[in-house]
């Protein structure tokens, strides 16, 4: 299963699993460890290529059998299962070590689902209208479920809720290009300050993807997640 209507994704790509867990470790996000005998609060202390280490101060003397680890981060709930954990010492702290999970269940919160693209990133949506005329619109924001398109100036008369973009090409630069069908759901008036602190008004077209295959859903979600990780890293520099 790749996605359902609740924003659930199963992350099985090794680089994604490592990237998510390393970010959780870096942010020191609390986690809960649960098995048949006990449950306790913990922190990820280390994420290696093949194993993870989490604090075990609140654990019993043994952590027997398979465990489920639950992490409630600011933008998602993450769950995964690990095998037998072994007690160890990590920089003077009682800890548990186990193998890197093969997959993560990643439930993205709707309020964080959409990523706004900075103005200096030229992410574009292009294609042809039914009459053969071409269009090229800037992608204002994106998610695994759709995109927000930006229109500066008057709206073309044909762009009304219910309009369908057929075979639209989403160009996300180094994050990939995707050809999709989309439906225009709603049009909102929006504004922002430009580099000279002048107010700029524009129209935002909220579009949803139509009948994406599982493979395409996965590719778009991976691109969104990779862009969000890179953008957050740059903001922290």
Curated annotation (Swiss-Prot):
Query: What keywords would UniProt list here?
Result: Bacterial flagellum, c-di-GMP, Nucleotide-binding
Biological process annotations from GO: bacterial-type flagellum-dependent cell motility; regulation of bacterial-type flagellum-dependent cell motility by regulation of motor speed
Output the InterPro entries linked to this UniProt entry: PilZ_domain, Split_barrel_FMN-bd, T3SS_YcgR, T3SS_YcgR_PilZN
**Where, per UniProt, does this protein localize?**
Bacterial flagellum basal body
**Annotated Gene3D superfamilies:** Electron Transport, Fmn-binding Protein, Chain A, predicted glycosyltransferase like domains
GO CC annotation:
bacterial-type flagellum basal body
Where the record annotates domain PilZ, the positions are 108-225
A Pfam family annotated for this chain is PilZ
Q: Where mainly located? A: other
> What GO annotations for molecular function exist for this entry?
cyclic-di-GMP binding
Which Cys pairs does UniProt list as disulfide-bonded?
A: none
Q: Does the keyword Ribosomal protein apply?
A: no
**Any idea what job this protein has?**
Acts as a flagellar brake, regulating swimming and swarming in a bis-(3'-5') cyclic diguanylic acid (c-di-GMP)-dependent manner. Binds 1 c-di-GMP dimer per subunit. Increasing levels of c-di-GMP lead to decreased motility.
Q: How does it assemble?
A: Monomer. Interacts with the flagellar basal bodies.
The family note in this entry says:
Belongs to the YcgR family.
Listed name of the protein: Flagellar brake protein YcgR
């Amino acid at each position: 299963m790749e996605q359902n209507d609740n924003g659930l994704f199963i992350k099985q790509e090794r680089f994604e699993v490592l990237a998510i867990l390393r970010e959780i470790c870096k942010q020191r996000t609390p986690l809960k460890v649960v098995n048949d005998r006990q449950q306790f609060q913990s922190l990820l202390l280390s994420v290696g290529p093949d194993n993870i280490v989490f604090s075990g101060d609140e654990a019993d003397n043994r952590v027997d059998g398979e465990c489920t680890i639950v992490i409630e981060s600011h933008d998602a709930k993450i769950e995964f299962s690990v095998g037998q954990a072994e007690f160890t010492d990590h920089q003077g702290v009682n800890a548990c070590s186990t193998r890197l999970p093969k997959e993560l269940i990643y439930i993205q919160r709707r309020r964080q689902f959409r990523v706004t693209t900075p103005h200096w990133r030229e992410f574009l949506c292009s294609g042809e209208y039914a009459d053969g005329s071409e269009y090229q619109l800037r992608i204002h924001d994106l998610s695994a479920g759709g995109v927000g398109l930006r229109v500066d100036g008057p709206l073309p008369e044909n762009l009304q809720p219910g309009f369908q973009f057929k075979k639209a090409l989403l160009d996300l630069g180094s994050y990939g290009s995707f050809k999709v069908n989309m439906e225009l759901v709603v049009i909102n008036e929006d504004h922002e300050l430009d580099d000279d602190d002048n107010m700029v008004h524009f129209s935002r077209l909220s579009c949803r993807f139509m009948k994406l295959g599982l493979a395409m859903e996965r590719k778009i979600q991976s691109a969104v997640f990779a862009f969000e990780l890179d953008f957050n890293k740059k903001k922290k520099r």
